[in-house]
Amino acid sequence: WLHRYLKNGNATLLRTDPPKAHVTHHRRPEGDVTLRCWALGFYPADITLTWQLNGEELTQDMELVETRPAGDGTFQKWASVVVPLGKEQNYTCRVYHEGLPEPLTLRWEPPPSTDSYMVIVAVLGVLGAMAIIGAVVAFVMKRRRNTGGKGGDYALAPGSQSSEMSLRDCKGDTLGSDWGGAMWT
């Protein structure tokens, strides 16, 4: 029975859960930036996080917290470095853990700027307006082509001179029985 418990325990003890890692960006009042490399949800607890500047490992200027339990049987850890604003892309975080087939190399990825979204929306709006105007122009031109360019197939009724008739020219004395026999005077 002891052998069976050891066999079942090995599956738990020998398991490896690779870390889920990402980098966050935090502006400081001093005008520079803190980059923080997070490793979450890993097992076993042994992990190494390092920061590099242009490929050279930083050791002195890095803040590193101890590995902590996450409360779900896995662990978490972070390492941070303070960098000049605008130089964030020169820094990379390396994550070493036995659950990873090879070490991870992470860099802070700035979110897409709202300015680029505004440009995209404006361009799409202009293109949409041009498409609508083009469709209207094409419709009008096609309609004119079909009518010979005269604006329509209208002709006067036979025997009519104009449409300027007055009510006095009408010969009917009544509007008919449907109108209650009202008379024109």
Swiss-Prot record:
Miscellaneous comment in the UniProt entry for this protein: Sequences of three cDNA clones that encode portions of three distinct histocompatibility antigen alpha chains are presented. These chains could not be precisely identified.
Origin organism lineage: Eukaryota, Metazoa, Chordata, Craniata, Vertebrata
Residues covered by the Ig-like C1-type domain: 19-107
The family this protein is said to belong to: Belongs to the MHC class I family.
Extracellular side: 1-118
UniProt keyword annotations, A-Z: Cell membrane, Glycoprotein, Immunity, Membrane, MHC I, Transmembrane, Transmembrane helix
Annotated InterPro entries: Ig-like_dom, Ig-like_dom_sf, Ig-like_fold, Ig/MHC_CS, Ig_C1-set, MHC_class-I_related, MHC_I_a_C
Protein function: Involved in the presentation of foreign antigens to the immune system.
Superkingdom of this protein's organism: Eukaryota
Cytoplasmic side: 140-185
Protein name: H-2 class I histocompatibility antigen, alpha chain
